[in-house]
Amino acid sequence: MKILAFTGAGISKQSNIPTFMERPDVREKLFRSYANVHHEEYNEVIKQLKANMNGAKPNDGHIALAEYNIPVITMNIDGLHKLAGSEALELHGGLPEDDEMDIAYSLYNKPVLYGDPAPNYQKAYEMVYTLQPEDVFLVVGCSFHTGISVDLREIAKSRGARIIEIQEDAAHNVRKTLEELIGDMK
């Protein structure tokens, strides 16, 4: 049995990072068309996002995935999976480095904006296509509001993989689910 995790904002919510759904004022500015026209305003939005994420620590959901060496596909741009020790495929990139903040509006994949190509989507599709009927697609904190979120679930279903959804209390339920699937590592 192989487990592949797919995570969204719900896993990082318990690390005190608000979701974009909770921040429509931010979400409406994460479009390439906005960044191209409103350079300074866009840069300020990215600075605010970075400030919200600076100091955030991986919660036990992130840590459990890393401890169990579960491959991760994430829609998040917070970098918490990597901080926890996972090799995560970041579908929407990350945030600019501090020395790039003044040119954030011109950067691609830092983060991927609405209207941008998403270079890691193909890799995600390929990862999910490897699932077999004995495998598990563990979906953590992902809504059905993005095309990629729906697509990956549909591919996993078409491959016969078991889909387990954790939409509440990811910080605790990820470890519990992995322990049930794999057993206690200790």
Language-model segments: what does each one mean?
Residues 1-186:
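Conserved catalytic alpha/beta core of Sir2/sirtuin-type deacylases, generalized to analogous enzyme cores
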